[in-house]
């Protein structure tokens, strides 16, 4: 069985960059250089899904990888048994979240919401919604006539499992979810 990373990308808050696990851990030299930087607090690694701190950890075969800290709260990447395809789709999602187009769409939605009567408490990418140990950070959050609404923007492939997970989470919380999907084939899923 081949080695499969469950966390393929991490966000370095020091540099503002997304780090690709397969790139930063491609050679022993690169791997241990990142580990050195981590232990000297030269990088601050965070999970792109849950925004919790990550460690640089080693396996019993000395393969370095990103790992949630001990006693970390719920994270979809940590708690869910994802296939290799689903893991890659999520990595694409996190890469896409940082694209200029994604940021433009979030800000454009917020701008349009500001002009609508009955809409308030508009937040772009900075509000967490909690359900027990689980939390989600929608791209755009607002209240419309005292109803909570969230917008999730997706510009790359996404598994139905991920869509249903988000749907179920927000439904449990009584929050209305609006997906903005790019070139999504409903019938092909």
Regions picked out by a protein language model, each given a short descriptive name:
Residues 110-150, 158:
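Active-site metal-binding core of divalent-cation-utilizing nuclease and nuclease-like domains
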Residues 154-189:
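Catalytic cores of nucleic-acid endonucleases
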Residues 96-97, 151-154:
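Short, contiguous strand/loop micro-motifs
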Residues 1-104, 111:
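Nuclease-adjacent, charged terminal/linker segments that flank catalytic cores
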Residues 101-105, 159-162:
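Short amphipathic alpha-helical segments
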Residues 5-6, 73, 121, 179-189:
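Short flexible/disordered coil segments
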